C-alpha cells in the first residue's frame, strides 16, 4: 500500500511574496509543458513552485533556488515552535493584536538573545509585528514596535516539503545561465528557458 504525500498549496511558514494565490493556476500551466523534463524555480523564495512542480510532475527534475534560506527555516520548525511556546507565556493575558508593553517586549528580546542556534526571525517577527511586516535579524526586530499577534498554534511539521527537489543557492541570473542551453527546461513563473 502506498502512502499519499501531502499536496501543498501554500508554504509551511510565512514568506513575503508567497505565491499561494496562484498555486492552482500554476498547476494548470504545468500541464501545458509536459515535454519539459527539468523545472527550475529560479526565484525560489518559499520553494512553493518547486514543491508544486514536483507534486504535479514527479518524473521531472525539479531545482529550487533557496536564495532566502527557506530550507533552514523548514528544518528548524521544532525550534521555532519551542520559541513560540515561550512567547505565548510572556504575552499570556494580553489582548490579541494589542501593543506589547515595554517590559514584555524586553522579556521577549531576552528570550531571543539567549538562543544559541538558528532562529527563524521571519516566522517569529510575523507573530510580533504589525500585519505583513517581517524582520530577518534580532537587531532589526529590536527596533520595531511589538504587537500581540503571537500564533496560537504551532507550525505544522513540514516533513517531505523539499523531498525529491534539488536545492541550490545562487543568483537567479547565474542559475538561468547554467540551464539556458539545456533542452526541455522550464523556468519558474513559466518562463521558458
Roles of regions detected by a PLM:
Residues 1-38, 48, 55-56, 123, ...:
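S-adenosyl-L-methionine
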Residues 21, 37, 44, 48, ...:
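Short, well-structured alpha-helical interface segments that form or flank functional binding sites
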Residues 28-32, 52-53, 155-158, 175-178:
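Short, flexible, glycine/charge-rich loop motifs used to bind or transfer phosphoryl groups or to couple energy/partner
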Residues 61-166:
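Class I S-adenosyl-L-methionine-dependent methyltransferase module
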Amino acid at each position: 500500500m502506498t502512502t499519499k504525500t501531502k499536496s501543498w498549496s501554500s508554504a509551511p511558514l510565512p514568506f513575503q511574496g508567497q505565491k499561494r494565490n496562484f498555486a492552482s493556476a500554476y498547476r494548470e500551466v504545468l500541464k501545458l509543458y509536459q515535454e519539459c523534463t527539468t523545472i527550475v524555480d529560479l526565484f525560489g523564495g518559499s520553494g512553493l513552485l518547486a514543491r508544486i512542480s514536483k507534486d504535479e510532475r514527479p518524473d521531472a527534475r525539479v531545482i529550487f533556488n533557496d536564495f532566502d534560506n527557506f530550507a533552514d527555516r523548514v528544518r528548524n520548525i521544532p525550534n521555532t515552535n519551542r520559541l513560540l511556546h515561550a512567547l505565548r507565556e510572556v504575552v499570556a493575558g494580553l489582548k490579541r493584536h494589542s501593543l506589547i508593553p515595554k517590559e514584555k517586549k524586553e522579556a521577549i528580546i531576552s528570550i531571543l538573545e539567549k538562543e544559541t542556534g538558528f532562529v527563524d526571525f521571519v516566522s517569529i517577527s510575523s507573530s510580533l509585528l504589525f500585519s505583513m511586516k517581517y524582520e530577518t535579524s534580532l537587531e532589526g526586530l529590536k527596533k520595531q514596535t511589538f504587537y500581540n499577534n503571537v500564533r496560537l498554534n504551532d507550525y505544522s511539521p513540514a516533513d517531505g516539503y523539499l523531498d525529491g527537489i534539488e536545492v541550490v543557492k545562487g543568483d537567479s541570473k547565474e542559475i538561468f545561465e547554467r540551464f539556458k542551453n539545456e533542452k526541455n527546461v522550464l523556468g519558474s513563473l513559466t518562463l521558458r528557458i
